[in-house]
Amino acid sequence: MASKSGDGGTMCALEFTVQMSCQSCVDAVHKTLKGAAGVQNVEVQLENQMVLVQTTLPSQEVQALLESTGRQAVLKGMGSSQLKNLGAAVAIMEGSGTVQGVVRFLQLSSELCLIEGTIDGLEPGLHGLHVHQYGDLTKDCSSCGDHFNPDGASHGGPQDTDRHRGDLGNVHAEASGRATFRIEDKQLKVWDVIGRSLVVDEGEDDLGRGGHPLSKVTGNSGKRLACGIIARSAGLFQNPKQICSCDGLTIWEERGRPIAGQGRKDSAQPPAHL
């Protein structure tokens, strides 16, 4: 189920590269993170600018804490609290409007998958979030197919036994239009969704409990606002890259730029929380 910051959940490990050059940098990072609710353990390695955090907070919130010290931070990898790499993936979400975000998938154990991320540009309120069958964005989000449903079940809520495997329930957007969420799911597996797509919808998912004809099909959550292909991503200590081999940008230069396209060559803009 989706949880807000400080609501607990299963611990995971987040690996960041942080711009640190001296012991005072290390001290500032320790002081900021160790006083934060939801952070259990912090390891800082100045020599390779690495910060390893054991936490129940979404990665975006940990990154914001790190950058509140005045230092840039980039998430490099995720893993279970036992520092095991059981599978990780990421979806970069975009649509025809202003909605955009990044959502990450992490297999915490063979029985539990973590889905966490931040989506901006939403109307305040609840929005349905689902894994869809196809990773096909040729017609924007309309070509992603139906909800991922290999069991042939009816649409339901994330806590239901009888549900589409891609049914992740709702995420809540604040007045700013931002939804930051952390979902733990017992049916979804990272290795089953790589190459598929993640879609956020215009309205609230009724979890199959409404009286609308689409309740048991889509949750009657309205049109698809933004989507992204779910791609394999780095686990802990699997991403040593400091410079992109494709265009020579450092991890600091490419921060806040698109992964590809003309905008990647433009001067860096303040990151849209991604």
Swiss-Prot record:
Task: Work out whether the entry's keyword set contains Iron.
Answer: no
Give the residues the record marks as binding Cu cation 1. Answer: C22, C25
Q: Which InterPro entries match?
A: HMA_dom (IPR006121), HMA_dom_sf (IPR036163), SOD-like_Cu/Zn_dom_sf (IPR036423), SOD_Cu/Zn_/chaperone (IPR024134), SOD_Cu/Zn_BS (IPR018152), SOD_Cu_Zn_dom (IPR001424)
Q: Where does Cu cation 2 bind?
A: C244, C246
**SUPFAM superfamilies with a match to the protein in the record:** Cu,Zn superoxide dismutase-like, HMA, heavy metal-associated domain
Q: Which residues carry this modification: Phosphoserine?
A: S267
Location, primary (coarse class): cytoplasm
Q: How is the cofactor bound?
A: Binds 2 copper ions per subunit.
> Which GO BP terms sit in this record?
removal of superoxide radicals
Q: How is it modified after translation?
A: Ubiquitinion by XIAP/BIRC4 leads to enhancement of its chaperone activity toward its physiologic target, SOD1, rather than proteasomal degradation. XIAP/BIRC4 preferentially ubiquitinates at Lys-241.
Q: Which cysteines are joined by disulfide bonds?
A: C141-C227
Please name the GO terms that the record assigns under molecular function: copper ion binding; enzyme binding; superoxide dismutase copper chaperone activity
**Highest taxon of the source?**
Eukaryota
- Where are the annotated segments for Superoxide dismutase-like? 88-234
Which metal ions or organic cofactors does this protein require, according to UniProt?
Cu(2+); Zn(2+)
Give the location in the cell.
Cytoplasm
Q: Does the keyword Repeat apply?
A: no
Tell me the ranges covered by the HMA domain, including all copies. Answer: 11-74
Name the PROSITE patterns for this protein: HMA_2, SOD_CU_ZN_2
**Which positions are annotated as binding Zn(2+)?**
H147, H155, H164, D167
Tell me where the cross-link Glycyl lysine isopeptide (Lys-Gly) (interchain with G-Cter in ubiquitin) is found: K76, K189, K216, K241
**What cellular component GO annotations does this protein have?**
cytoplasm; nucleus
Q: How does it assemble?
A: Homodimer, and heterodimer with SOD1. Interacts with COMMD1. Interacts with XIAP/BIRC4. Interacts with SLC31A1(via C-terminal domain); this interaction is Cu(1+)-mediated. The heterodimer CCS:SOD1 interacts with SLC31A1; this heterotrimer is Cu(1+)-mediated and its maintenance is regulated through SOD1 activation.
Family per similarity comment: In the C-terminal section; belongs to the Cu-Zn superoxide dismutase family.
Described function: Delivers copper to copper zinc superoxide dismutase (SOD1).
Q: What is this protein called?
A: Copper chaperone for superoxide dismutase
What is this protein's gene name?
Answer: Ccs
